[in-house]
A protein has these predicted regions:
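AAA+/P-loop NTPase substrate/partner-engagement loops
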Residues: 54-80
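Conserved AAA+ ATPase "SRH/arginine-finger" region at the nucleotide-binding site
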Residues: 62-67, 143-144, 158-160, 171-185
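Pre-Walker A (pre-P-loop) alpha-helix and adjacent loop at the N terminus of AAA/AAA+ ATPase modules
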Residues: 2-34
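Conserved AAA+ ATPase small/helical "lid" subdomain
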Residues: 170-188, 192-223
Length: 223
């Protein structure tokens, strides 16, 4: 667990959220589940990747907007024509996995309900009576949005269902903050390979007025 303190070096500007995550690991046994919400490009995906790195776990990202229909459940968890499901084949090879359920709010209700059961039971039994164990899995569910949106104030049926099914089941709900101008400058300085397009989108998302050309010149002078 001491390795997890390194997360603050990778995830800049989210000290409170990282502290909540480390505390959860100190007091809870696997499987562990987190729900992380916040604006775009604030570190949600990077958190899952870095967590897998420091735990020495396999990393798997599922984009849940690909699972909006109920039939997509079979591709995810059911064996079809003797072909193992995505999660069965992954967890058979890598029982210790950090599983990122990205944009969890876009998944169909059947999948949300199913994962809420997995959080309770620690396993899933498919139609062929094969058990998929999730006992050594770290779940990270992510959603882009503000606290009012993600915590159930948004009048959407899907968000209400998500709140009802999952929020009482997850071990920790973490809010990530928008990145300040100073943090973004630090990220750019530390990661010189970051694309100009990504920087532009990040600044636009956070409504931060900044002279990008001037900043890049300053960074080159500092290097």
């Amino acid at each position: 667990l001491s390795q997890l303190k390194q997360l603050n070096k990778d995830i800049l500007g989210q000290e409170k959220g990282i502290h909540q995550m480390i505390e959860t690991f100190q007091h809870k046994q696997l499987p562990i589940s987190f729900f992380i919400y916040g604006p775009t490009s604030c570190g949600k995906t990077l958190t899952a990747k870095s967590l897998a790195k420091y735990l020495n776990y396999h990393y798997l990202k599922l984009d849940m907007n690909q699972y909006q229909e109920s039939h997509s459940l079979y591709k995810l968890l059911e064996t079809y024509h003797e072909k193992p499901s995505l999660l069965l084949s992954t967890l058979q090879s890598y029982p210790h996995t950090v599983l990122l359920l990205d944009h969890i709010d876009q998944a169909c209700e059947e999948i949300i309900h199913l994962f809420s059961q997995i959080f309770d039971d620690g396993y899933y039994e498919d139609q062929a009576k094969r058990k998929i164990s999730f006992e050594n899995v770290v779940f990270i569910m992510s959603q882009t949005g503000t606290s009012r949106c993600c915590m159930g104030f948004k009048k959407s049926r899907q968000t209400k269902y998500l709140k009802h099914e999952l929020f009482d089941k997850v071990d920790q709900i973490i809010e990530y903050q928008p990145l300040s101008k100073e943090i973004i400058e630090k990220i750019i300085h530390l990661r010189e390979h970051i694309s100009i397009e990504k920087i532009h989108n990040l600044l636009k998302e956070e409504h931060i007025p900044i002279n990008l050309s001037k900043m890049m010149k300053q960074i080159k002078q500092m290097s």
